[in-house]
């Protein structure tokens, strides 16, 4: 069986980081975007994941290792983006969650219990370069920002992999935000003046 070419972890991490940073720069989160991309797959540097990749070993959580590195700077919401970059943004959970619960707290506890393979100490994972954030309850604005960062990371991850597999694929630039807003407004205008009997009640 002919073996497919393998993209190195370093190349994928750097490519994803640059793409994610460029996307996130649009709303002032370039540094967070870069770190999310740079560390989202740190867990692939574990012996467990390499066995999965090279020898069809058991499935391994590769998303939590990098998330925990970022979480050490109190960037919990960014860590949640990384933790869920394949499975979806996790609920943050509560202190009652046991290790392995499908929440941020559950996976954090599973990590602390060493039930998730650690990164191979011989792999040179770069340090997380983010300022520590004060611990506080997330606001609505932070919740929205988190979803934007999550979208940036998922898109960057997918596009970097696509580029490696298929080469550079030309993509349309799409319409700008002003054009899209006008199009949405025209669509919503249909409901401004109710004309049906039901809408007039």
Residue map of PLM features:
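Accessory nucleic-acid engagement/destabilization modules that flank
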Residues: 1-191
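N-terminal pre-Walker A segment at the start of P-loop NTPase domains
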Residues: 189-201
């Amino acid at each position: 069986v002919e073996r497919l070419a393998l993209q190195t972890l370093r190349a994928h991490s750097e490519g994803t980081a640059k793409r994610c940073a460029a996307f996130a720069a649009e709303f002032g989160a370039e540094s967070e975007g870069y770190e999310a991309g740079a560390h989202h797959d740190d867990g692939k540097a574990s012996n467990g994941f390499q066995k999965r990749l090279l020898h069809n070993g058991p499935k391994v959580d590769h998303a939590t290792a990098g998330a925990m590195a970022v979480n050490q700077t109190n960037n919990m919401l960014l860590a949640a983006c990384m933790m869920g970059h394949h499975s979806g943004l996790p609920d943050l959970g509560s202190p009652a969650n046991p290790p392995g619960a499908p929440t941020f707290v559950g996976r954090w506890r599973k990590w602390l219990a060493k039930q998730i393979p650690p990164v191979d100490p011989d792999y040179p994972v770069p340090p997380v370069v983010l300022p520590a954030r004060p611990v506080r309850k997330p606001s609505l604005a932070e919740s929205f920002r988190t979803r934007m960062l999550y979208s940036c990371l998922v898109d960057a991850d997918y596009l970097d992999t696509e580029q490696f597999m298929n080469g550079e694929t030309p993509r349309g630039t799409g319409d700008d935000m002003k054009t899209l807003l006008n199009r949405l407004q025209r669509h919503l205008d249909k409901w401004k003046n109710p004309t049906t009997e039901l809408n007039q009640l």
